[in-house]
Amino acid sequence: MSRPEHIAPPEIFYDDVESKKYSSNSRIIEIQTKMAERAYELLAIPETAEGLMLLDIGCGSGISGDVITDAGHYWIGCDISQHMLDVAIDREVEGDVMLRDIGQGFPFRAGSFDAAISISAIQWLCNAEKSHHNPRKRLHTFFQSLFNVLTRGGKAILQFYPENSAQIEMITASALRCGFSGGLLIDFPNSSKAKKYFLVLFTGNNNIMPSAKGVEGEEYEQQEEEDSNEVKYSNRKRDRRRVTKSKGSAQHKTKEWIMNKKDRQRKQGREIKNDSKFSGRKRGPKF
């Protein structure tokens, strides 16, 4: 399936039809909300803190902004798609929204925001949508402007979908050159579906990196990718137990084989039942 940034520029891709999915498609809303909640969690804002000002980069229809509102803070969101902002206005979000190309920086005074989050937006900066666009220059402008509008000691959590390792390196290096400290955090790194990339950036010295999820086989609730709306069907033939040609019975799996498979699936982030004394034990004859 083609990546959205390969189909059209964001202001064209997120047209009236695509934008309305973000207010009517429960699956998209659920995924966006969970990623925004994770981004806010990584900010590690003390529960005693109230009324902070946050910047929502690529705010879209305001789903991630709702998470900020629920946490008791104020926010300003910017997005390049007028249609997405129209949906946010129709939803009567609490924050203020503005039309803005983040590759041109932010029109705010220095130190205006205590923190910033972004969900599925900054990978668009790696594409040259116009002849005069230079991805490296646009990334530099973005990160330098973001560094300036954050307070000293502020933090930014940017979730994104990198196309390859070179893109990760280009984004991370650009952020560090602009004065940020921090790095890349990957939730569920062993799972192709649940893997999520977060760029964790600090403007001050309090730069302790948070812990990633799923590194030690932590269980998770499996979810589809944000931009995938396809219905998945199980392959019944593949799911059936393999039958040997000679005896016509299911091929026997040893206890060691079963335990190794369960351990591998846990590392991939799948929900696997806990081991018991019956795990891998041969069952008696059926009635």
Curated annotation (Swiss-Prot):
Residues 217-228 have a biased composition (Acidic residues). Residues 214-287 are annotated as: Disordered. The keyword Transferase applies. Residues 253-278 have a biased composition (Basic and acidic residues). One of its GO terms (cellular component) is nucleolus. The keyword Methyltransferase applies. Keywords: Cytoplasm, Methyltransferase, Nucleus, rRNA processing, S-adenosyl-L-methionine, Transferase. It is an enzyme of class 2 (transferase). S-adenosyl-L-methionine-dependent methyltransferase that specifically methylates the N(7) position of a guanine in 18S rRNA. Important for biogenesis end export of the 40S ribosomal subunit independent on its methyltransferase activity. S-adenosyl-L-methionine-dependent methyltransferase that specifically methylates the N(7) position of a guanine in 18S rRNA. Requires the methyltransferase adapter protein TRM112 for full rRNA methyltransferase activity. Involved in the pre-rRNA processing steps leading to small-subunit rRNA production independently of its RNA-modifying catalytic activity. Important for biogenesis end export of the 40S ribosomal subunit independent on its methyltransferase activity. Belongs to the class I-like SAM-binding methyltransferase superfamily. BUD23/WBSCR22 family. This is Probable 18S rRNA (guanine-N(7))-methyltransferase. It comes from Dictyostelium discoideum (Social amoeba).
